[in-house]
UniProtKB/Swiss-Prot annotation:
Zn(2+) binds at residues 12, 15, 68, 71. This is Protein yippee-like At4g27745. Residues 8-105 form the Yippee domain. InterPro entries: Yippee, Yippee/Mis18/Cereblon, Yippee_fam. The keyword Metal-binding applies. Keywords: Metal-binding, Zinc. The lineage of its organism: Eukaryota, Viridiplantae, Streptophyta, Embryophyta, Tracheophyta. One of its GO terms (molecular function) is metal ion binding. Belongs to the yippee family. Pfam families: Yippee-Mis18.
Length: 106
């Protein structure tokens, strides 16, 4: 009998707290502060910081930095508002820096 495989998870690089599901990845083609980043539809076990307007590669956005709830490691940010119509799909979504997350249970 084959063993059931659970969800593929991403964890905080520092403490291994689960922060995202592979199935929630919308795109792997984003740029973060430290390099490549992934856009997720959902996140878990994170703290969302205060909102601020930030000029990003795709224009002005209101974002809030996100960090691990357990160790406070900065992980990326949440898109709160996109000012350009073409960028509205990002609202409510999360950017995780690839360097800040690791695959867990794969």
């Amino acid at each position: 009998m084959a063993q059931a495989i659970g969800p593929r998870l991403y964890s905080c690089c520092n403490c291994r707290n689960h922060v995202g599901l592979h199935d929630d990845i919308i795109s792997k083609a984003f740029q973060g502060r430290t390099g490549r980043a992934f856009l997720f539809s959902h996140a878990m076990n994170i703290v969302v910081g205060p909102k601020e307007d930030r000029n990003l590669l795709t224009g002005l956005h209101t974002v809030a930095d996100i960090s691990c709830v357990d160790c406070n490691e900065p992980l990326g940010w949440k898109y709160e508002r996109a000012y350009e119509t073409s960028q509205k799909y990002k609202e409510g979504k999360f950017i995780f820096e690839k360097a800040k997350i690791v695959k867990e249970d794969w």
